[in-house]
């Protein structure tokens, strides 16, 4: 089987997982530190989605570390099927949450001019959304690699 960049059990796969984890955690921290985020469903959904993304990425990063340390092969059909489903689910949830939160911020900023109010931390929301989109980009890349590997078995 051909070795792809981002395959499970490789350094590039570990770097994809760490990127997902770091940006998902940064998104959660930025959103949770913004006062009043709980009043808006899109930001609650963003925290839930990025929390799930962080947990999934942490688990697979640990699995990649284990595989690298003990030189294990993670290219079995069962494992790749699990990775494909998990990556696609988290990627779709991350994208939906990022888009919905971005839509709310665009509404606040461009339509009702609520970001002029200093009590609404639009800058933190924008930072959280940017981190969420970056986490989604890593997740979508990983999902495509896993799907490609599964298809090549």
Curated annotation (Swiss-Prot):
The places in or outside the cell where this protein is found are: Cell membrane
Top-level taxon in the UniProt lineage: Eukaryota
Residue stretches spanning the membrane: 21-41, 43-63, 77-97, 129-149
Query: Cytoplasmic topology: which positions?
Result: 1-20, 64-76, 150-153
InterPro entries xref list: CASP_dom, CASPL-5
Q: Name one GO cellular component term.
A: membrane
State the membrane topology.
Answer: Multi-pass membrane protein
Principal location: membrane
Extracellular compartment segments: 42, 98-128
| Keywords from the named record | Cell membrane, Membrane, Transmembrane, Transmembrane helix
The record describes its quaternary structure and partners as: Homodimer and heterodimers.
* Similarity comment: Belongs to the Casparian strip membrane proteins (CASP) family.
Q: What protein is this chain from?
A: CASP-like protein 5B1
